[in-house]
Amino acid sequence: MIEEIEKNQPWTSPNPSMDEQGWPHFSEHSLFEAAVGESAREHQVSREMAMMCALGAIATACQGLVDVEMPTGHRVPTSLMLLTIAESGERKTVTQNYFFEAITNLNDVAHRTNEAALLQQKVDHQLWITQKKHLERAFNKCATQGDEAATHAALEAVAEHLRAEPQPVRSGKFLYEDTTPQALVHMLYENIPHGCLLTSEASSIFSGKALGELDKLNTLWDGGSVKVDRISRDSFVLQNARLTLSLMAQPNVINRFMSKRGEEARGTGFLARFLVVKPRTMAGHRTNQKLSKLSRKKAFNTRIQELLTSESSSERQVLQFSEQAKDFWFMCNQYLEKQMQENGLYYYLKDHASKLLENTSRLAATMHTFERKNNSDIEIDIFTLKFCWSFTQNCSKHFIEHLANEPQIITDTNLLAHFLLKIAYKLDIHSPDPETETNRKSDPFRIKARPVQPGDLIIGVETTFTLSQVKQSGPSVLRGRANSERLYSAIDLLTKLGHVKRERSRFRFRESILLSTGEPELKNGQIITIKELPLFCEQEFVQENNSNCYTSGYRIKII
């Protein structure tokens, strides 16, 4: 994806490396990468789940310190809304505890301090009530005696005493578990206005009764003011608050919510603000091993504590992007705009696509703040932005798969790939046969014999086709002139994935990637997934070997 966006650009800035599942790596010696690697290795959890927990902790620590100015000049908060969908047994709580240790400890200290302060406030308030009664009796006595001067003085004493009423102590608590949006807003108002909703079972947020209150969470994500009108208690306005959501939920909770209220939640824009990950399952694939000293955990949480306890001014620091990062940001923006057009990946997901680059910018700002060595460094570099763009694009893929209906272009491309594979398998041969070859010359879907392959690798089937042939006998939704644009878009996507190549008036299709050098513009399984075809990570590039008649190109791994 980065290669496609940067095509024909003059700079040669490094791109983040990817793991086997297509998730990006940050800088090798960064606190983030070290802690994520240690957590994934020691707890035997997926890297993507470890990254989501780490980013939740980082956003919680940074949201009160910095905002980010996007290249358009628009200033936005750095709060994040993160959702990890994982089954029971995937060690969600263990992973959360690893990255949120410092946050939990600071929150516990704040809670204990507040309890002691509340106890003292109750004593002070009771003494205040006693003194108030004494002053009121003195006032009544003066008023009864008709001493105007004494009455006025007693009244002033009562008024001054009322103004000095001991108020409830504002708590430093900022970490909240499963609760409703209404209660959350109230606690942010009564406590410090920077908080994190952390839960491994987000049932309250994804319950039907909370749906009418989700607009409050939208407003907090936007950085706006939340107005709360109440009859039984004083109304209030929550201003300049920041809230990060680091939620984990089981698939059945999300599926139930989506089936009952998903369309409404999409309509409010609530789901579009989330970065979503459904980690690969690790339960049943773990080995017995003893935990190490977890030294990376200590370094990570020490940095989190530094950020949360640092002196902050009333004005948040505003981060900006470097010039190269700005150029890359605008190219990402153009890519998203193009994909929101008809037949684009995000044509039916404009709500989600419109938030992707802002989420990328927020993520880049928090990563920069967490890793920087000097607080005066306010410029986000292009590598950090590229890492965050790769991460949010992977999250986008998970959003499409688990919180949204499949885009039309993905459905069409799967249908076309299925159709072509069916033809190719029907015509497939493993060695040249003159008689068969003669008969196949009259077949419109021609296929070449497969060459010799290295062990444990296959090239897959291939065939050729023309537009008119697919329009006549292909999938019904891609037939005819009326559906030409949909067919062209599906072919274009297969071309970018490397499975289709134009050869004059015909197109060549192969089950494996057709390229003999380099990588495709898009990698199957990264950002988008065409389930009919092997994933990019399920293929291997083979160098030419004349002694064994191997030709350079991609082969499918035999699992």
Give the location of each predicted region.
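Phosphate-handling catalytic cores of nucleic-acid transaction enzymes
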Residues: 1-559
